[in-house]
């Protein structure tokens, strides 16, 4: 009865688990879904200029964004030989977090010869946001994973300030649990406010895009991506190889969310063309 009562809300853990399998016809489909609040999974779509049999699904949030104290965990499992595209129907808003930080963890498992695309729209960071984003990939032989982690800044009318911090960890593992590649980003509002040349400058949107897979023509991919992104307006891009022969990474910094989205679509279309021979259309969202 006399125990100390904290004024802070309890950490809230919410999970969605979605698995994909390949039908005898060759088409990929959702074979398992455990999706609770705030996640909502739309029906499986077949979209023009996608590879034959690819399953495209969109995740949405019913809560209006990410809030202080939340811990969201999304688990996507692409079975052997599946082709899967997962995105979001809209950008996710990370609201001001005065009491506690929030964490969003995404686990991607791509089994043998699977193609898994996890390409959500950028997270919108409000003033005083404190968010940790983590993406963990398990890569099986012959699998290909496209993934993106992106954010942009927004100050609603009548408010002021910058995000407290944004941290992103992207890690790629073998089926045995060996770390193949890792990428870490940590930035604070104070860093952004300084507008340092070579760090952020005047740019307010940033993304990391990766193609993860072994046995890829890395040098050809690097050259093609650099040529594709060379003349993108209002953006600065860098392309590099990941260690342990597990793919390529693209870092994009843009003036705003529109420029960032344009650059990311070009990177995605370039890689999809190289992998499947088909370039995707711009998606309406």
Swiss-Prot record:
Transmembrane segments: none annotated. Keywords: Chaperone, Cytoplasm, Nickel insertion. GO terms for cellular component: cytoplasm. The keyword Cytoplasm applies. It comes from the Bacteria. It is found in: Cytoplasm. Its main location: cytoplasm. Signal peptide: none annotated. One of its GO terms (molecular function) is nickel cation binding. Belongs to the UreD family. UreD, UreF and UreG form a complex that acts as a GTP-hydrolysis-dependent molecular chaperone, activating the urease apoprotein by helping to assemble the nickel containing metallocenter of UreC. The UreE protein probably delivers the nickel. Required for maturation of urease via the functional incorporation of the urease nickel metallocenter. This is Urease accessory protein UreD 1. The gene is ureD1.
């Amino acid at each position: 009865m006399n125990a100390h009562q904290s004024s802070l809300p309890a950490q809230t853990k919410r999970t969605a688990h979605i698995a994909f399998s390949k039908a005898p016809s060759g088409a990929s489909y959702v074979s398992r879904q455990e999706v609770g609040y705030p996640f909502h999974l739309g029906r499986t779509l077949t979209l023009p200029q996608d590879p034959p049999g690819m399953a495209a699904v969109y995740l949405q949030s019913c809560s209006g964004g990410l809030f202080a104290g939340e811990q969201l965990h999304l688990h996507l499992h692409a079975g052997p030989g599946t082709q899967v595209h997962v995105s979001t129907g809209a950008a996710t808003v990370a609201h001001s977090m005065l009491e506690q930080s929030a964490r969003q963890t995404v686990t991607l498992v791509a089994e043998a010869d699977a193609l898994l695309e996890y390409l959500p729209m950028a997270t919108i960071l409000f003033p005083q946001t404190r968010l940790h984003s983590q993406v963990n990939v398990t890569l099986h032989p012959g699998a290909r994973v496209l993934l993106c982690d992106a954010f942009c800044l927004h100050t609603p009318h009548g408010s002021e300030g910058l995000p407290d911090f944004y941290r992103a960890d992207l890690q790629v593992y073998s089926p045995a649990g060996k770390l193949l590649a890792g990428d870490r980003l940590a930035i604070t509002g104070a860093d952004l406010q300084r507008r340092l040349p070579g760090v952020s400058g005047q740019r307010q949107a940033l993304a990391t895009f990766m193609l993860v897979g072994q046995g890829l023509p890395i040098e050809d991919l690097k050259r093609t991506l650099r040529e594709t992104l060379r003349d993108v307006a209002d953006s600065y891009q860098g392309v590099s190889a990941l260690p342990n022969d597990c793919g390529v990474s693209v870092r994009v910094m843009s003036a705003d969310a529109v420029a960032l989205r344009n650059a990311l679509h070009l990177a995605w279309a370039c890689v999809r063309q190289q992998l499947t021979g088909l370039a995707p259309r711009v998606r309406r969202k």
